Amino acid sequence: MLERRKPLDLLFPLKGSATTREDGEERQSMTALDHVRAGVMLARDAVKAVSVTAMEALREGATFIGIVGEKNELVDPFEHLDAPIWSDRPPQELTKLAFRYCEELTMREAGNFYHSFKYLPDEQRNAMCAVYAFCRRADDIADGDWADRFPGSQGEMDPEAVAYREQLESLQDQGTILDEEAYLNKITQLFFFRKKLSTCYSEVYSTDPVFLALKETVDRYSIGREVFDDLISGMEDDLYNNRYRSFDELYVYCYRVASVVGLMCIEIYGYEDPRAKKFAESWGIFMQLTNVLRDVGEDIQRDRVYLPLDELEANGITEPELGEQVVLNKQWEPYCRDYARRARTYLAEARQLLPLLPRRTRYSPAAMIAFYDKILRQIEKQQGDVFTKRVKLNKVQKISLAAAVYMRHRLLPAFLDPLWTGLARIGLLPAV
């Protein structure tokens, strides 16, 4: 009979986990049936489902359930349910409530992104908000203090959560950059976050509004699970790495936390040309490279350096200089120019995505690309000064960019698009 701790060890191997020779031999001898048993033990609480009576009561009260609390805080409308799933499809009223929750979360946490969703058809806007809410929650777990509800549990004291935590505590040499308590908390929550993701690809429905809305989204737009798993893996990277030796290492990180989001988005936008996937990957790389440069000053205060270390060394730039802001010297500005030049190679590919998308959905990615292009230009204009103040767009810049994007990608007849491109090259129109 399997030990209580073994299922988590089998189904969720950890980086750098300490194993004995006997453990290795035992794992190699595990049969398919043993793996099934392990899975059953791990997910046993997930068989609990909200009763039909409770579901009907929720359906009747859905129009009265609020998602904003007395102190204007965002409230999970299903937080008092003591079961993790609905075994049957919940009423449409509850799914609509879940989408409302995701939309409110997006408006609160990412006004610029929400603006870019503004002109999408309702179904696609809802889907984009569900995807954003998933990404936001994963990031909040890895990089913030979000306390997620564990499925089939009463939180941290759930037997399976306790068993998993004990298993983690028994492992040695994790190589995490966090203190032990923070690491155990975050890796446990990300594990259960993956469990919730599983409901989106099964016959049950999560009582977490984010995953209820996400399930409807992945079903409607046939989005594969791999991109969501990759994003969670990117969040896990932040628990182990706070330095990247080379651009190749940084690229993998950027792909996991940003490119996969672009790949999710294009399934919602719609496309036929397979090149759209390559350009969506470049779109994510461009945006994340811009984020990395913009946030250098803030990241170094959190003991994180995302810029490739080999490139900093080659340019005579040291970490202490980044932290003390004395890096604003003759080495830093040329490095920033080279960095921006490489980011723009991905920007050029990202822009090739736009003509491959339907006109009705093109504004959304075009606006995001234009905003980040402007941020990168502003960094260059400030000679790479990302230390003394955060680089961001003011309201006038946002409005003017949004108007230009709207005009080009929603109003301008297609046959005039080359004319806009030509005038943008000589500076008579914005390059959006």
How should these model regions be labeled?
Residues L2-Q288, L293, G297-V432:
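Catalytic cores of Mg2+-dependent Asp-rich isoprenoid enzymes
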